[in-house]
Every structure is written in C-alpha cells, then in structure tokens.
C-alpha cells in the first residue's frame, strides 16, 4: 500500500470527528426512509437507432454515455451491495436500469474514487470479460487494485492529468471528497471528477463531491 496520503485542494482530509460509539449509535438507531418506487423505462433499447449523443442514467453514479465517438461507462456498480461483503453492507433499493449483459460495447470505463458504491470490483471484472479492449481510467492509487483483479488495461491519474482517446480528451479534475475501502487506507488513493471534451460535446461527471473552490 502506498504511504502517500492525499488531501483536498483546500488541505482538508474529511477526517471524521465522530467516535466509533457515536457512529454505531447512529447506524442502529437511524430511521430508514420510506422506499420510493421509481418507474423504469426501456427507451434505452432504442439506442441502436440513435448511435451517438446520448446519456442514460443506470443508477446512483453509473451513467452510459456516448459523445459521438466513444461509448463511456462511469462508476459502474451493478452489485446488490456496496460493500466488501455479499451478506452485509448498504443494499441497493432499486435494480440498475440496464443489466451488465444488456450494455452495448464499451470503449472507456471511468472511476471517480474507490468507495464501494463507486468502485465495484465484481462489476469491473465482468465488464473486462464482456469488453476485453475497454480502457479503465482510475484515480492515482487504484490501478493496483484493478490489476490485482486481473484488469490490465488501466491508466491512473493525478488531478489535471489528461489523455486523448479518439479525439476525446479526458481530464481528471479535483473535487471535495475523500477515499477509503478499509480501516487503514483512508486517503491513500485519489478522488476526482472526469471532464470529457470532444469537438462536438463536453461531459462532466463528478462522482461524489461537496461544493468547493474547485468549481469556481
């Protein structure tokens, strides 16, 4: 594990001021919100007739995008739980609008940060099998995690680093957040948003963020 620790651009690191006791009290006494029924649509199946310029919200931070030259998938999470455990942890209330097997061929997969509700290794491994030529773009510090899972076609980025793919420039930008997948890796990998710019269209996907000077 890298010894490097990252902070936000304003030098904050989102260290929790709550004790474990306070967290557990909140966790087991909080009131669960009522489940909201969201109607899903199968209009996305018409994408084959509209081969470019579309954005489909699949769920949470997962979007299927096409900018006319590339098909892009952001923060792919298709598992039932955002957790390292299959029987515990936050469970999704609503199934993804599109299943992994229903997705079109994917060129680029972006990850904003390593929280389990944004970096789902099980989903990424399946996507690699379905799209062997897809390129994975991840924050600095997360490449090792993907390669350990057999995903080799990975590039990792610091803030403001960029890569151009088929006339689309991908730039990794600062956001106000933090990272961790366990108890001892807080802020050991970076977090950020993706700005995707081509000749015809610009797309920005922030992942998770609070408001900060980064957006001014």
Regions found by a protein language model. Name each.
Residues 1-91, 96-102, 196-207:
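Metallo-beta-lactamase
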Residues 3, 87-138, 153:
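Active-site metal-binding motif and surrounding structural segment of the metallo-beta-lactamase
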Residues 59, 139-145, 158-160:
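Short, polar loop motifs at secondary-structure junctions
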Residues 76-78, 114, 175-177, 207-209:
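Active-site metal-binding loops of divalent metal-dependent hydrolases
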Residues 115-119, 143-145, 161-164, 178-180, ...:
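Active-site environment of divalent metal-dependent phosphoester hydrolases
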Residues 122, 179-216:
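Active-site-proximal loop/helix segments of hydrolase catalytic cores
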Residues 135, 147-166:
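Binuclear metal-ion centers of metallo-dependent hydrolases, dominated by the metallo-beta-lactamase
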Residues 156, 162-183:
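Flexible, acidic/histidine-containing loops and adjacent segments that form or flank the divalent-metal
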């Amino acid at each position: 594990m890298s010894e490097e620790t990252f902070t936000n651009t304003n030098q904050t690191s989102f260290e929790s001021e709550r004790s474990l006791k306070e967290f557990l009290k909140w966790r087991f006494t909080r009131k669960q919100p009522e489940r909201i029924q969201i109607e899903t649509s199968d209009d996305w199946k018409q994408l084959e007739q509209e081969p470019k310029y579309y954005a489909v919200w699949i769920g949470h931070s997962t979007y299927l995008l096409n900018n006319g030259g590339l098909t892009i998938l952001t923060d792919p999470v298709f598992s039932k739980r955002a957790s390292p455990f299959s029987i515990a942890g936050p469970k999704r209330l609503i199934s993804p609008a599109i299943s992994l097997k229903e997705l079109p061929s994917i060129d680029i997969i972006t990850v904003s940060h390593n929280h389990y509700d944004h970096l789902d290794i099980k989903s990424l491994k399946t996507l690699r099998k379905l799209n062997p030529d897809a390129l994975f773009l991840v924050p600095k510090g997360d490449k090792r995690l993907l390669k350990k899972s057999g995903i080799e076609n990975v590039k990792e980025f610091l803030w403001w680093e960029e890569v151009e793919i088929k006339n689309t420039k991908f730039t990794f930008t600062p956001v106000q957040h933090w990272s961790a997948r366990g108890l001892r890796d807080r802020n050991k990998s970076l977090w950020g948003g993706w700005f995707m710019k081509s000749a015809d269209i610009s797309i920005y996907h922030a992942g998770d963020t609070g408001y900060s000077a980064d957006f001014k």
